[in-house]
A protein has these predicted regions:
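Extracytosolic ligand-binding ectodomains
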Residues: 2-14, 21-114
Length: 114
């Protein structure tokens, strides 16, 4: 329920400000979610929800880059660094609290925790 509320909030913000999202370059949003392992269904559901939200506001300037955290803090940091190398400054996730422990190393990224 908590994840659903946060996703709905993000969607609501995107829908209310579509003019601010229209830009000459792509807006890149990273996703740190479990796409393998025991929690892969949660991750796949979040990816699908975010993509539906982007389609709902009909903005082709937004690109979503999902990365698999495998539900592991070390893998989460690795995935976040990969997104950072792609010059992605906004990341939604990670899903699990335990995966937050190393992310303070990445000061130039804005995380929206689920």
């Amino acid at each position: 329920m908590k994840i659903s509320f946060k996703i709905v909030t993000i969607i609501f913000i995107l829908i209310l400000n579509p003019q601010k999202l229209i830009a000459s370059e792509k807006i890149k949003i990273g996703l740190l979610v479990p796409l393998s392992g025991n929690s892969k269904e949660i991750g796949k559901s979040i990816v699908q929800s975010i993509r539906l939200a982007v389609n709902k506001i009909d903005n082709s300037n937004i690109e979503v880059f999902p990365k698999d955290t495998k539900g592991d803090p070390t893998e989460t940091l690795k995935a976040a660094k990969e997104l950072s190398l792609k010059n992605i400054k906004i990341i939604i996730g990670p899903v699990f609290n335990k995966n937050l422990i190393y992310l303070n190393e990445l000061e130039d990224i804005f995380f929206i925790s689920l």
